[in-house]
Amino acid sequence: MAAAVAAAGAGEPLSPEELLPKAEAEKAEEELEEDDDDELDETLSERLWGLTEMFPERVRSAAGATFDLSLFVAQKMYRFSRAALWIGTTSFMILVLPVVFETEKLQMEQQQQLQQRQILLGPNTGLSGGMPGALPPLPGKM
């Protein structure tokens, strides 16, 4: 105890062990441990149910209605997005993909014709000679 008084005079803060006698400090620790054990017996659902009791019935019912409405809206949006995605995907496959395949096929045919012209007539004629609307090759350069 004399050490505690001397430490207090020096301006240092006292620890709980220095303030309480040793027997009382041990009892305080045991009581804290017992309090913790009592709190651990309670489940999470029991704690949440207990927390709801601190709000008035009006607030609880409003929160419940808001949650139900949010759940309903989320379900409706999910169903709508599924239907919209299905309609969009099938429409794209039926309407757009055939056009894409035909344009790709046409480009491949044009590329093959260009390659055949280059093979038969030479490298310079494949680019300028066979294309309609293109300028004729210059007479001095061959």
Curated annotation (Swiss-Prot):
Q: Would you tell me the Gene Ontology cellular component terms?
A: mitochondrial inner membrane; mitochondrial outer membrane translocase complex; mitochondrion
Provide ranges: composition bias, Acidic residues: 27-41
Reproduce the free-text note on domains from the UniProt record.
Answer: The N-terminal domain (residues 1-62) is important for binding to the unfolded mature imported proteins. Residues (49-71) of the cytoplasmic domain interacts with TOMM20 while the C-terminal segment (residues 63-82) binds presequence of preproteins. Requires the transmembrane domain (TMD), a short segment (the import sequence) in the cytoplasmic domain localizing separately from the TMD and the C-tail signal in the C-terminal domain for efficient targeting and integration into the TOM complex.
Name the family: Belongs to the Tom22 family.
Query: Which membrane topology describes this protein?
Result: Single-pass membrane protein
Residue ranges of region Disordered?
1-41
Question: Could you name the domain of life of the organism this protein comes from?
Answer: Eukaryota
Cite the record's Low complexity compositional bias ranges: 1-18
* Annotated spans, Import sequence: 41-50
- Please list every transmembrane segment annotated in the UniProt record, as residue ranges: 84-103
Cite the Pfam families for this sequence: Tom22
Note the InterPro entries from the entry: Tom22 (IPR005683)
The alphabetized UniProt keywords are: Acetylation, Membrane, Mitochondrion, Mitochondrion outer membrane, Phosphoprotein, Protein transport, Receptor, Translocation, Transmembrane, Transmembrane helix, Transport
Q: What is the lineage of its organism?
A: Eukaryota, Metazoa, Chordata, Craniata, Vertebrata
Q: What is this protein called?
A: Mitochondrial import receptor subunit TOM22 homolog
* Species in which this protein is naturally found: Mus musculus (Mouse)
Note the PANTHER family from the entry.
MITOCHONDRIAL IMPORT RECEPTOR SUBUNIT TOM22, MITOCHONDRIAL IMPORT RECEPTOR SUBUNIT TOM22 HOMOLOG
Positions on the Mitochondrial intermembrane side per record topology: 104-142
Where's it found, cell-wise? Answer: Mitochondrion outer membrane
